C-alpha cells in the first residue's frame, strides 16, 4: 500500500513538472519559436527553431531538420523540472539532447547538447549554455 501511494505520488509529480514542456505529444507553445545563443542578436543566422513536432538547426543556408522527437522522462533523474527531447531519426544514440526547462513559467529556457554528433555540433555551434528566445 505504501509503495503504491509513493509511485502514484511520483507519477503525479513528474506529470506536473513536465506538463508545461510537452502537451499531447507536441512541444508546448511556450517553447516554440526561434532560439539563438544567449549573446547573439535575434538576427543571428545561427539558431534553433522549435515547432510543435519538428526541431530545425539553422546556420545561414545550412539546415538540419528532425521530425522524430521523443521525450526522455528519465534522462535527468527524479525531481527535475525539465523535459529532454531526443531525436530518433537515426539509429543508435540520438544526435542531440534539447532540454526544455519550464520551472519558471514566465521565462521558459532551452539548452542544447550536441556532443553525441560532432558533425552536427561543428555545423551548428550553439554552445552548451542556455539559448534566448527571439520573438
Where are the regions that the model predicts?
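Bacterial N-terminal signal peptides that target proteins for export
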Residues: 1-10
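Mature extracytoplasmic/luminal segments of secretory-pathway proteins
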Residues: 13, 39, 69-72, 131
Amino acid at each position: 500500500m505504501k509503495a503504491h501511494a509513493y509511485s502514484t505520488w511520483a507519477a503525479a509529480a513528474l506529470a506536473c513538472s513536465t506538463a508545461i514542456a510537452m502537451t499531447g505529444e507536441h512541444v508546448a507553445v511556450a517553447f516554440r519559436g526561434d532560439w539563438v545563443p544567449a549573446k547573439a542578436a535575434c538576427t543571428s543566422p545561427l539558431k534553433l527553431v522549435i515547432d510543435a513536432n519538428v526541431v530545425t538547426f539553422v546556420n545561414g543556408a545550412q539546415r538540419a531538420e528532425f521530425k522524430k522527437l521523443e521525450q526522455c522522462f528519465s534522462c535527468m533523474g527524479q525531481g527535475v523540472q525539465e523535459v529532454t527531447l531526443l531525436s530518433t531519426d537515426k539509429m543508435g544514440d540520438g544526435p542531440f539532447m534539447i532540454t526544455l526547462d519550464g520551472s519558471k513559467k514566465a521565462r521558459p529556457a532551452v539548452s542544447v547538447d550536441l556532443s553525441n554528433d560532432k558533425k552536427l555540433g561543428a555545423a551548428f555551434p550553439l554552445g552548451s549554455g542556455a539559448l534566448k528566445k527571439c520573438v
